[in-house]
Amino acid sequence: VKDKAFTLIELLVVVAIIGILAAVGVVAYNGYTGAAKVNAAKTNHTNMVKKVSLIIQQCNLDGSVSMMSKWGNKTVFNINCYPNKFTFFSDYLINDMYNSSRWDNPYRAGQNNALQPGWCTNAASGGGGNVGFVWINGRDSMDHVTVCTCTKKPCGSSDILENKIYID
């Protein structure tokens, strides 16, 4: 009677092949998720630039906009445009965006906010610790609103998106 079974060497070869395939798969998966995070950060940035542009156009037409300006409150308020640009863009607009939909930092999903008030230097500071945040800044002394995002570490100049949206 002849037994049919795999030899120890054959089994070790199969285990080695599975290990190699798993290692290649993990590297490919990490590259895929890294690219997805960069793209999500870029999308958040682009959406914020579009929203700021839309708000400025609405202000130019009507002098006021409807926003859910209070954090965690879905009540829509009619807000006069630019009584204080910092409060208007960095408080009311950020609150409206969060109340309208969920914004996550792709690098810290579910842990903290993706939208932050502040200067573009904030996007580049912290040695990459601010990666994924969208920074919004409008000041009374400025004729524009700035939107900045670090899309990937180390948050060097080539990793920062910056848009200035001018207030007409």
Identify the function of each model-found stretch:
Residues G34-N73:
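Conserved hydrophobic/amphipathic alpha-helical signal-anchor segments
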Residues Q57-D168:
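Periplasmic/extracellular, small/polar-rich flexible segments of pilin-like filament-forming proteins
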Residues N30-T33, K37, N105:
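Poly-acidic low-complexity segments
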Residues K2-T33:
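N-terminal single-pass transmembrane signal-anchor helix
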